[in-house]
C-alpha cells in the first residue's frame, strides 16, 4: 500500500490576460493544458502535483477575493501559492526583463514571508543565464505607481512594486498555512518608465522572460513538497 501523502497542488496567480498568455505560451516540455479561458484553469503539469493557473483580475481586492474563493475548494486545500506577472522596479540600475524574487511581500495590512527564495534565485539564474535576478521585499499598491512615489517606496527598502502579489499571498495564508512565493518580471524601472505594456521594447522583453519561468515554478513546487531534514 502506498503510504505517501497526496501531492500538494500548486496555484499560480497572475492578474492580466497578457501575463496569462505568456505563461500559456511558455513552459515547453511542461505541458500547456487548460490555459485558454479566463479565471482558473487546471492542468496536471508538474511532478509535484496538480497545477492551477488563476487570472485574478487587476488590483489587490480582485486578487485577494479570487484567491480566497479558489482556495475554499477542498481540492486546493493546502495548495502552495505563487504570485507572478509584471512589476515596476524601484532600485536604480534595474532594467525591463530583470527578475524579482520576493523575500517577503508587504502592504498596509501585513507582511508575508516567502518560502524557497534561494531555490528560486538559483533556478532562475541557471535556466535564464544572463538575466539579472534581484531579491528583497516586494510592496503592494492599489494603483499604478509613477515618479516621486516610487522613490518613497524605495526608501522603505522595497525593490519592486505591483498591485497583486501582497494581496495574493496575504489572502492565501489567511486561508491556512501553506508555502507561498512571488516572482515578478520588471516591465519598467526608474530609468525605463513604461506607458503601456506591449508598446515598447521593455514590455516585449518582460513578456519573453515571463514565458520562460514555468519550469522554475515547477521545481519550486517539487522542492516545497520534500520533508524538512
Language-model features: where?
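Glycine-rich beta-alpha junction loops
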Residues: 16, 88-90, 142, 167, ...
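Flexible, glycine/proline-enriched loop segments at strand-loop-helix junctions
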Residues: 55, 107-116, 153-160, 197-200
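Active-site rim beta-loop-alpha module in soluble metabolic enzymes
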Residues: 115-176
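His/Asp/Glu-rich mid-to-C-terminal helical/loop segments that flank catalytic regions of hydrolases
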Residues: 191-229
Amino acid at each position: 500500500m502506498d503510504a505517501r501523502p497526496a501531492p500538494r497542488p500548486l496555484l499560480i496567480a497572475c492578474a492580466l490576460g497578457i501575463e496569462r498568455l505568456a505563461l500559456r505560451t511558455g513552459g515547453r516540455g511542461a505541458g500547456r493544458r487548460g490555459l485558454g479561458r479566463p479565471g482558473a484553469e487546471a492542468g496536471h503539469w508538474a511532478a509535484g502535483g496538480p497545477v492551477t493557473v488563476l487570472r485574478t483580475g487587476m488590483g489587490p481586492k480582485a486578487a485577494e477575493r479570487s484567491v480566497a474563493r479558489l482556495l475554499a475548494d477542498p481540492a486546493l486545500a493546502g495548495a502552495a501559492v505563487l504570485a507572478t506577472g509584471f512589476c515596476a522596479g524601484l532600485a536604480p540600475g534595474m532594467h525591463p526583463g530583470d527578475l524579482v524574487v520576493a523575500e517577503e511581500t508587504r502592504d498596509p495590512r501585513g507582511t508575508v514571508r516567502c518560502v524557497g527564495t534561494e531555490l528560486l534565485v538559483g533556478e532562475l539564474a541557471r535556466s535564464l543565464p544572463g538575466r539579472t535576478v534581484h531579491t528583497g521585499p516586494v510592496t503592494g499598491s492599489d494603483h499604478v505607481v509613477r515618479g516621486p512615489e516610487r522613490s518613497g517606496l524605495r526608501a522603505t527598502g522595497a525593490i519592486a512594486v505591483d498591485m497583486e502579489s501582497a494581496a495574493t499571498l496575504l489572502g492565501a495564508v489567511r486561508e491556512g498555512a501553506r508555502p507561498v512565493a512571488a516572482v515578478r518580471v520588471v516591465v519598467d524601472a526608474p530609468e525605463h518608465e513604461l506607458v503601456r505594456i506591449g508598446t515598447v521594447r521593455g514590455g516585449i522583453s518582460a513578456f519573453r522572460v515571463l514565458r520562460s519561468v514555468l519550469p522554475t515554478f515547477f521545481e519550486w513546487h517539487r522542492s516545497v513538497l520534500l520533508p524538512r531534514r
